Amino acid sequence: MRAETQTIKMTEASSPTPVLEMRGISQIFPGVKALDGVDIALYPGKVTALIGENGAGKSTLVKILTGIYRPNEGEILLDGKAVHFHSAQDAIDAGVTAIHQETVLFDELSVGENIFLGHAPKGRFGLIDWKTINERARILLEQLESTIDPTIRLKDLSIAQRHLVAIARALSVEARIVIMDEPTAALSRKEIDDLFRIVENLKRQGKAILFISHKFDEVYEIAENYAVFRDGKMVGAGTLATTPQDEIVRLMVGRDVTNAFPKQAVTLGPTVLSVRDYSHQTEFRDISLDLRKGEILGLYGLIGAGRSELCQSLFGITRPASGEVTLDGQPLTIRSPEDAIRAGIVYVPEERGRHGLALDMPIYQNMSLPSLTRTSRKGFLTAANEFALARKYAARLDLRAAALSVPVGTLSGGNQQKVVIGKWLATKPKVIILDEPTKGIDIGSKAAVHGFISELAAEGLSIIMISSELPEILGMSDRAIVMREGLMAGQFERAEFSPEKLVRAATGNA
């Protein structure tokens, strides 16, 4: 009997017949066995949580299930009959649809076009029926309790709204199996509640749902069953109602994670960055803050509070309407990201795949991009210098990769985050802004990233850390600023921290 390949067992009363089974699935890449004989079963009307550290094999399983990869070994059964997915369309035709962590949408298309791309309703003479597209899109969005206009372009939406469009797109296909890969990563609590109401409705319709999340509170709230992957194997499966969280953590990482927030005590130095009366035309106003040498300043708030917009302005992505910025006591005017980088301010964005990385390029080139003047000789790039720079920061960050020449897109989320941080550290900054630094990262990798952030602060780097995860703010920050609707709603020293204080400030419930 192999403990690594347990199939989820359900009581006969709940649902004796799985709609989908994967048996003995193995996926082999050059030098790597990404999946090793895993079994999993999904049942109608039930949510199964797929849990594991980044690199455990979850993404590979999803790609097999959605027809992107064909397994080297094993079989997929749909209603007890073997099926073979040769393409993503084969999987869709069989009733399998996916909502991915990084929204795969098109900025220049309308919301309705994105929802029905590839399966647009057509009218007479085979022409696309735009009226029907927009009507159906509006109905789907209303089911998600969203008032997004289907006719506007996607690029005009916020990250949270983009995720709702991605969910609507998945629901636009008549699916029996719905895969949700970190669907709540950019959603507010209200939007998560709305999504979970949708999930409950899908369960009542008999949909089988595979739910991938690193947020244990969400897993226990929405799922009935779980399957834990580690190092390409299934190491545990069962019913969440009878399994404590500590047991799942041990299965995930193969060890106890006792210190998720390894914050080092640091003697803070002088003020490095000072912002006064800083305002944007629409996103934030009257922001004043100071950041000291070696300090981790947490920015907390709900989605849409203006935190990312503030930091993007400090990095030169957008222009402020008014206000002053000083760095090391000297006035600073930032008109572009180049100005910020030259001054020593860098920004690690929330959406790594869209703004932080060139996913098709190798690791070493991604890491050296902001430091081309240091890796070139007489105006010409040298691969040797690029590799040397990448090796230095890959070692420092404990980057897990087969080689520095592999595309960044092949890495797990945690390792992609290390590449983004590494490329900016190579510029030797004074201030680093981390926007949701552990978004989509598993619990083991989170602890590693937190440890590294703490080390950077201990070395004297000044850090602004945006996070929507309250435990992360409380565990890692020396000081926390709460924003609400573009304004500063509160500022707290570490000794004053409490979850209640920060949540009240963020929600306006005094």
UniProtKB/Swiss-Prot annotation:
Membrane topology qualifier: Peripheral membrane protein
Cited InterPro entries: AAA+_ATPase, ABC_carbohydrate_import_ATPase, ABC_transporter-like_ATP-bd, ABC_transporter-like_CS, P-loop_NTPase
Domain of life: Bacteria
Subcellular location: Cell inner membrane
Enzyme kind, highest EC tier: translocase
Keyword Translocase: yes
Assigned keywords, A-Z: ATP-binding, Cell inner membrane, Cell membrane, Membrane, Nucleotide-binding, Repeat, Sugar transport, Translocase, Transport
SMART domains: AAA
EC number: 7.5.2.7
Domain ABC transporter: 20-256, 266-510
List of residues binding ATP: G52, E53, N54, G55, A56, G57, K58, S59
GO cellular component, one term: plasma membrane
Subunit structure: The complex is composed of an ATP-binding protein (RbsA), two transmembrane proteins (RbsC) and a solute-binding protein (RbsB).
Protein family according to the UniProt entry: Belongs to the ABC transporter superfamily. Ribose importer (TC 3.A.1.2.1) family.
Role according to the record: Part of the ABC transporter complex RbsABC involved in ribose import. Responsible for energy coupling to the transport system.
Protein name: Ribose import ATP-binding protein RbsA 1
Organism of this sequence: Agrobacterium fabrum (strain C58 / ATCC 33970) (Agrobacterium tumefaciens (strain C58))
Top-level taxonomy: Bacteria, Pseudomonadati, Pseudomonadota, Alphaproteobacteria, Hyphomicrobiales
